[in-house]
């Protein structure tokens, strides 16, 4: 019988920042900043970075007790949002500009965590989740989640420029490159559309790469994040919530186990259906963000009727450099998924008239005959018969 006591140096419990991230209090990076600022307490004492806690420890953030029982009931939720131009990626803007959180559904517990950022002039795909660990893994460079953008550049683009952007150029914060560049249809004159892929989410990286070649980016839109595509069914300024299958695929990409979703009550299902119909319509002119305009009122929750599952790909995770050598080139521009729910545009009726010759005179227009309105009182009045 071995009477040797257990090793006292074996760590007990789980790291504090990981616990709070999993409960959806914030991303792991956010929690680490809060701990460094002294905003997190454990059992009444200021917490330290890397401190381990168990289920019996009382955790407070800014004086508010984190109720783990209520937080444990929350599930992993993910939103796909089509960000319009003019919205800033912050929760509270001191200038009163619209933010990306204004139109998201309100949560009873936890909060929405944005996966990465887009600058105010960039549109397109943004992901939100209630799982801080999922958000942290999706943003971490070690998981190599590729981002694809549609970009319109102004200026003459040469093959030498494309080669330099693929091989890598030196920016202010270090070397950067595209893993793939494909020319897209559209554009006139010196305006050209391209689809390009980057393997990290550095600040304004796509714009700075094109500008390093003396080109001007006139439009920029993110169209894909890892396996998640932005389809035309999700209109600008709208969002939809991923279903269980989509969340499982996205979670497997970063090595997380699936989390089961609870059944919806009848009242919750009816509310979701109402908001689903509401989210299906495009934004009204008064709802669109504009420069210098004050923040729009918060929209209630809802989801788009159309759902699109992300394409399944091999699972990703932190890999040693030796195993990553074969993927140094990154990923190419992905093939767009078929939008089966999209209705075909009605074809315009062809004009059967013969084409006009250069010397022909324009056809004479028929005179417009103005009809006189009926005289007042002409007709059946309520409550009377003729």
Curated annotation (Swiss-Prot):
Basic and acidic residues bias: start-end ranges: 267-276, 284-306, 335-354
Pfam families: PseudoU_synth_2 (PF00849), S4 (PF01479)
Root EC class: isomerase
SUPFAM superfamilies with a match to the protein in the record: Alpha-L RNA-binding motif, Pseudouridine synthase
Catalytic site: 119 (nucleophile)
Assigned EC number: 5.4.99.22
Superkingdom as given in the UniProt entry: Bacteria
Domain called S4 RNA-binding: residue spans: 14-75
Keywords: Isomerase, RNA-binding, rRNA processing
Catalyzed reactions: uridine(2605) in 23S rRNA = pseudouridine(2605) in 23S rRNA
Start-end of Low complexity biased regions: 307-321
Stored InterPro entries: PsdUridine_s_RsuA/RluB/E/F_cat, PsdUridine_synth_cat_dom_sf, PsdUridine_synth_RsuA/RluA, PsdUridine_synth_RsuA/RluB/E/F, PsdUridine_synth_RsuA/RluB_CS, RsuA_PseudoU_synthase, S4_RNA-bd, S4_RNA-bd_sf
Segments for region (Disordered): 260-386
Molecular functions per Gene Ontology: 23S rRNA pseudouridine(2605) synthase activity; RNA binding
GO terms under biological process: enzyme-directed rRNA pseudouridine synthesis
Family: Belongs to the pseudouridine synthase RsuA family.
Function noted in UniProt: Responsible for synthesis of pseudouridine from uracil-2605 in 23S ribosomal RNA.
PANTHER family: PSEUDOURIDINE SYNTHASE FAMILY PROTEIN-RELATED, RIBOSOMAL LARGE SUBUNIT PSEUDOURIDINE SYNTHASE B
Name by which UniProt lists this protein: Ribosomal large subunit pseudouridine synthase B
């Amino acid at each position: 019988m071995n009477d040797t006591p257990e090793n006292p140096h074996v760590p007990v419990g789980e790291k504090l920042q990981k616990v709070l991230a999993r409960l959806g209090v914030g991303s792991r990076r956010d929690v680490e900043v809060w701990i460094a600022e002294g905003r997190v307490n454990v059992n009444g004492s200021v917490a330290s970075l890397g401190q381990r806690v168990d289920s019996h420890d009382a955790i407070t953030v800014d004086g508010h007790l984190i109720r783990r029982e209520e937080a444990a009931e929350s599930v992993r939720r993910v939103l796909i949002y089509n960000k319009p131009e003019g919205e800033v990626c912050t929760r509270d803007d001191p200038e009163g500009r619209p933010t990306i959180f204004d139109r998201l559904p309100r949560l009873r517990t936890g909060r929405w965590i944005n996966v990465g950022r887009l600058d105010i002039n960039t549109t397109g795909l943004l992901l939100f989740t209630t799982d801080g660990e999922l958000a942290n893994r999706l943003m971490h460079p070690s998981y190599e989640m590729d981002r694809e953008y549609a970009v319109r550049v102004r200026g003459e683009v040469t093959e030498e420029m494309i080669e330099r952007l693929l091989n890598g150029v030196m920016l202010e914060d270090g070397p950067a490159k595209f893993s793939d560049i494909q020319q897209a249809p559209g554009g006139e004159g010196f305006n050209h559309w391209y689809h390009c892929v980057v393997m990290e989410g550095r600040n304004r990286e796509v714009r700075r790469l094109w500008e390093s070649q003396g080109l001007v980016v006139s439009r920029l839109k993110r169209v894909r994040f890892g396996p998640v595509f932005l389809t035309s069914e999700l209109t600008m300024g709208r969002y939809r919530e991923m279903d269980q299958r989509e969340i499982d695929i996205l979670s497997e990409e970063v090595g997380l186990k699936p989390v089961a979703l609870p059944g919806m009550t009848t009242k919750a299902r009816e509310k979701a259906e109402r908001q689903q119909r509401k989210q299906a319509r495009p934004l009204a002119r008064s709802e669109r963000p504009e420069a210098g305009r004050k923040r729009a009122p918060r929209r209630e929750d809802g989801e788009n009727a159309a759902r699109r599952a992300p394409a399944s790909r091999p699972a990703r995770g932190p890999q040693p450099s030796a195993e990553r050598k074969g993927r140094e080139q990154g990923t190419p521009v992905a093939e767009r998924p078929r939008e089966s729910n999209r209705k075909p545009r009605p074809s315009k009726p062809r004009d059967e008239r013969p084409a006009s010759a250069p010397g022909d005179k324009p056809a004479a227009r028929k005179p417009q005959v103005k009809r006189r309105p009926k005289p007042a009182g002409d007709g059946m009045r309520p409550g009377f018969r003729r």
